[in-house]
Amino acid sequence: TARFPAKLVHGHIKQLVDQELPLIFYPCMTYNLDENQSDNHYNCPLVAYYPEVIAANMDLNNTKFLYPFISFDNEKNFVEKMIKAFETVDIHFNKNDVKIAFRTAMNKYRDFHEELVQKHIDAVKFAREHNLQIAVLCGRPYHLDPLVNHQINQLLTTLGFVVVSEESVPR
């Protein structure tokens, strides 16, 4: 059976379909980005292939649903798959534009993590300067959904903790 966060996807997709969007892009991703932090970088099967569950089990009305298998591990492969996938719905991209978009996204992703680490350093410094406890919240990306996380970060903050994410901790 699907875990609760996976079931939330149905509600999010329904909201998009109700807006009568012409296309929803929700790719299947066997692998997550390899951040060289573990032996592998597989996504959980439910996360990786849930777009197939949506395609097979939801009434999408007239909304096209594009769910190609993609990976960020190989730029050339990513660019080719994206171009081919969007051509199936009569959307055409220039190969060089997709390459630039890929590289820009990877750079922004790296910059985001560098900024996150700096925010962590600032938060720890603040906590030490003010003699506050630090709580590290660990979880999955879907834990950002307030329905899933029950605002535990806000609760911890009201209890006097400085809250940082697992992802922000310098490696």
List the model feature ranges, each with a label:
Residues 1-171:
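An N-terminal assembly and electron-transfer interface module characteristic of large anaerobic redox
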